[in-house]
Amino acid sequence: MTPNFNWNATAFFQQLTEQNKLAKEKRFRFCRVTGLQGFEEALGSLQSAKAIVAIDDTSQGFMELVNTPHTRRVKTVFFAMRHAIDDMAARARCMDTMREVFRQFMSRLILERTRLEQKAIYLDERIQFQEIDEYFFSGCACAYFQVAVDTFTDLRFRYNEWENLPEMGTFSPAFTQDYD
């Protein structure tokens, strides 16, 4: 069985962070986190960094059992930038910067999307940028976006993956009941 091709979102967004001129100018540092709690822990590193791009190395998802079975995974990317506490103008400037970094990331994601579709990987075209409430972390503007990734999933039944199966065309006693 050949494994399904998968997209390495972590490596992709790390590369974007390292290559984007605005992200470099504003000193964004890339990091991997595990969930929102991991992002909160990463915010503690803002003592040594001015801004971060953090990707959640876990993903939410589901599998659809339809004519073209696929698996959907949702990857979350967080942004955070330090600013002076209680300075709403500075917070607004940070949000503007993060929105612009997001826009520039999306300009590269469009190109990546075309490449991925050639490998039967489909990105949801609706990617929302969400600002996190100003009281989430004092002195820090935060936002996130999520990318939904659909990949073809080979669900062909293979006898060699199972043991002690009945012959083809017969039912297992566990699945037969008298419905009279």
Regions inferred by a protein language model and the residue ranges of each:
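Extracellular/virion structural assembly segments
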Residues: 1-11, 18, 66-72, 78-109
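Small/polar-rich, solvent-exposed N-terminal microdomains that initiate assembly or binding
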Residues: 1-67, 161-180
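Acidic-leaning, charged glycine-interspersed low-complexity segments
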Residues: 6, 17, 23, 95-152
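Short, solvent-exposed beta-alpha or beta-beta edge segments that form flexible loop/patches at the rim
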Residues: 28-92, 122-141, 155-159
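A hydrophobic membrane-anchoring alpha-helix module
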Residues: 146-165
